[in-house]
Amino acid sequence: MTKKLTPQEKKNRKPAVRACVFCHQKHLQCSNERPCKNCVKRNIAHGCKDIVRKRVKYLTGEGVSGTVSSKQSTPRKKLKTSPLSTSMSPTDSMKSDLATPVESSNHFPASISSSVDVMTATQPSAMNTPSDAQPINDILEVPPLFDNSHMINSDVPGTNITLTTQNLITPDPLSFHTNTVSNTTTDVLNKLLNDNYETESLLSVNNNGDHLLEMAHTSSGHLSNGQQFQSNYLNEEYMMLGDIILQSKQVSPSPSNTSTSENNTNTLSPSSFGYMSNINFEDFNQPKKKVVQKLKDSRPFISLGFTEELAPHDSSNNADYYGHRMTNDIVGKTDEGPGNPIINYNTKFTTDYVPPSITNNLYKTASDLYSKELKNFYYPLSYHALTKLLKVIFGGNNLSPEEKQEKRSKLLIILKLIASYRPTFIAAHRDLIQEDLLMLEMTLQRSLLDYKKLAELNSSPTIMWRRTGEIISITEDMALLLEHSSFDLLKERRFIFELMDDNSIVDYFNLFANIAVGNLKSVIQTAIQMKTKSSNLIKFTCVFTIKRDIFDIPMIVIGQFLPIV
């Protein structure tokens, strides 16, 4: 039995740099001297030696070459041989060597396996094939990824091909093209419908559509005429990817997206090639929009949004609702649809500004939001007004060059902070339809009713503003502290930054940028200085509470201020 050590002995014990073989196997505490104490106690001191550690590959100099060589040196599993395989010609040996990697990689199984079968059937040196050679052919016949009806038929007598290393290793360009998704969606599909369409010249010579049909067979990489992938899952994935390429129109403030994605609307969906047998190619001299509409109607269409040019006008199409995308030119809505009764009432989609003094008097209860007219809030105009205000605050003609430079540096800091989170806001809201914007505004007004009731029960002065800084509510005591009238602050577009000094504005944007995206912190404590109407400064300690919308984007900021006397 192992002797129990005292606490002092345990403290004095130090682990050995390297254990001996015996201590390593028995998981004992070895000592640094040789022979060690454990081996001396057991009378095996003559065999006490350091354990040989296994060195890692990067220390021994072994790299990728060593790994490859070890894999290549591994003996392959031998197939069940036959008398034919024992007396194999040099060409046959090359064929068997090349068949195994093709079988494992499964890149071009259809073409190569067909070529191998033809070679087996037409090899003059091969005599009658025994019956036990059939398992070899069964192993070599891998189920193809595509239908191989377009390949060489090995059953036709007299068919003979020359089996060389070049035509075995070099794949068919069209087969490789159909097996590459990126090439298919960018190269092959764009040949059928683009601005410099090749068919226009073909149709001018021959209008019967035969050249077009032949080019469609070639360009589609043997996927036309009803031939599809063998996997239903892969077919559905190709359908959805093709619909996204054809119909999705990206709306982004970056110029790179607007120059390429929005203008390239004439790309044909790859999913339509499996259904081209339903389309009359003789009518391809009609406009492109009608052709694309036929491609859509040939199967149940999966869409994430239509472009304005190719939006269908058939009310029976299940994607027609998404044709009316959100644009900057928002039009009025007069007809009530069969959709959500909460949203579909007499509502106007407008970019006109409605001051908070009107909305606060209009929506005094929750039922008013559903019974009275509601207008959406257009945030881009609010951000433009904010930018103009910041330029006025941090500008000035009667300042020294040093003061101008200091104010300019602060303005640049603020604009960089706004640019850090505003693209995320745009990305979250760019695909929203007009009813979604109304729903967000209704959520804001409904939350505002609750917060205004809470502010009446709270003794601290309170101001509420949108994420742009636009004031939407202020208590009377806070307005009196700042020597303002609450009606004057709410009758027009006013920002909370008009009531702060320069340093407080910079501090606020630093805090807001940290919690605007990613960080879901909802409470911020800080100290700021507010300006009165007579340009006096009052120092406040304040708490900012952030209310977020369904996209976790700040919707309302509730600021509670306590003056420091």
Curated annotation (Swiss-Prot):
Region of interest called Disordered, as start-end residue ranges on this chain: 63-106, 250-269
Gene transcribed to yield this protein: GSM1
A GO biological-process term: cellular response to starvation
Function as written in the Swiss-Prot or TrEMBL entry: Transcription factor which regulates nonfermentable carbon utilization.
Organism the protein comes from: Candida dubliniensis (strain CD36 / ATCC MYA-646 / CBS 7987 / NCPF 3949 / NRRL Y-17841) (Yeast)
Keywords of this entry: DNA-binding, Metal-binding, Nucleus, Transcription, Transcription regulation, Zinc
SMART domains the UniProt entry points to: GAL4
Compositional bias segments (type: Low complexity): 252-269
GO cellular component: nucleus
DNA-binding region: 20-48
Protein family membership: Belongs to the ERT1/acuK family.
InterPro entries per record: ERT1_acuK_gluconeogen_tf (IPR050335), PAS_13 (IPR056751), Zn2-C6_fun-type_DNA-bd_sf (IPR036864), Zn2Cys6_DnaBD (IPR001138)
Lineage: Eukaryota, Fungi, Dikarya, Ascomycota, Saccharomycotina
Compositional bias (Polar residues): 82-93
Name assigned to this protein: Glucose starvation modulator protein 1
Alphabetized GO MF terms: DNA-binding transcription factor activity, RNA polymerase II-specific; RNA polymerase II transcription regulatory region sequence-specific DNA binding; zinc ion binding
